[in-house]
C-alpha cells in the first residue's frame, strides 16, 4: 500500500493517519462505488474500473475494500475537523456552537456513502453500533471536548464538567447520525441544549 501522511491528530482517534493526497483518486472512486453499490457489494474490481487501473494496482495502493473504507473515513473525518475548527474558534455565542455541532451531523447524514448505508444497509449500522459503539464514542469524545471547552469559554463558567458534557454531546451526535431527527439538526440541537444554555447563561 502507498504511504500515508504523517503524523495526524486522527491517529489519536484510533484511525489510520490521513491518507496521502496521491490516494485521493482511489478514495474518490471508492466513495463513488460505496455510494452506488453499498459497502457490502463493492469489490476491488469496481474501484479499479472507476479509477481506470488494474485490480492489482488498487490492492497495492489502498488494499481491500475494507481498507479503502477505513482510509476514506480517515480522510473525510480530517476534512470535517479541518473545516469546523475555524468556525468553532470564531463562535462567540451558543448559537455558533450549536451550528458547529449541527454541521458535523449534517456532514455525516448527507455524505453519499453514509446516506446509502442508512437507506439500504441498515443492518450494517446496527452491527456497527453494537460492536463498535465504545470505540466510536471515544473518537467522538475527542472531537466533542473542544466544542464543550469553547462553550465554557463563551459562558464564562468554570462549573461545567467538561468530560461529562462532552460525552453527552458525543452520545447525542452519534444517535442523531444513526437515527436522524425528523427536523433540521440545528433546530433539534437548540431545543435539546436549551436547558444547558439557560443554566450557563450562554444562550445568544
Question: Predicted segment positions?
Answer:
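Short, well-structured alpha-helical segments
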Residues: 98, 102, 159-170, 174
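Basic, helix-initiating cap at the start of DNA-binding domains
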Residues: 1-50, 66-70, 75
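Short linear capping/connector segments at secondary-structure termini
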Residues: 86, 118-127
Amino acid at each position: 500500500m502507498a504511504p500515508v501522511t504523517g503524523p495526524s491528530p486522527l491517529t489519536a482517534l484510533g484511525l489510520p493517519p490521513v491518507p496521502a493526497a496521491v490516494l485521493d483518486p482511489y478514495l474518490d472512486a471508492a466513495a463513488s462505488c460505496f455510494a452506488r453499490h453499498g459497502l457490502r457489494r463493492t469489490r476491488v474490481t469496481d474501484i479499479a474500473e472507476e479509477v481506470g487501473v488494474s485490480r492489482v494496482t488498487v490492492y497495492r495502493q489502498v488494499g481491500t475494500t475494507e481498507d479503502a473504507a477505513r482510509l476514506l473515513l480517515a480522510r473525510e473525518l480530517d476534512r470535517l475537523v479541518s473545516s469546523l475548527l475555524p468556525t468553532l474558534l470564531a463562535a462567540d455565542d451558543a448559537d455558533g456552537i450549536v451550528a458547529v455541532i449541527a454541521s458535523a451531523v449534517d456532514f455525516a447524514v448527507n455524505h453519499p456513502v453514509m446516506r446509502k448505508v442508512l437507506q439500504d444497509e441498515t443492518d450494517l449500522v446496527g452491527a456497527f453500533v453494537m460492536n463498535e459503539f465504545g470505540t466510536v464514542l471515544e473518537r467522538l469524545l475527542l472531537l466533542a471536548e473542544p466544542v464543550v471547552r469553547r462553550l465554557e469559554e463563551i459562558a464564562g463558567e468554570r462549573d461545567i464538567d467538561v468530560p461529562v458534557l462532552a460525552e453527552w454531546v458525543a452520545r447525542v451526535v452519534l444517535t442523531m447520525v444513526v437515527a436522524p431527527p425528523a427536523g433540521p439538526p440545528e433546530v433539534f440541537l437548540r431545543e435539546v441544549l436549551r436547558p444547558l444554555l439557560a443554566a450557563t447563561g450562554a444562550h445568544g
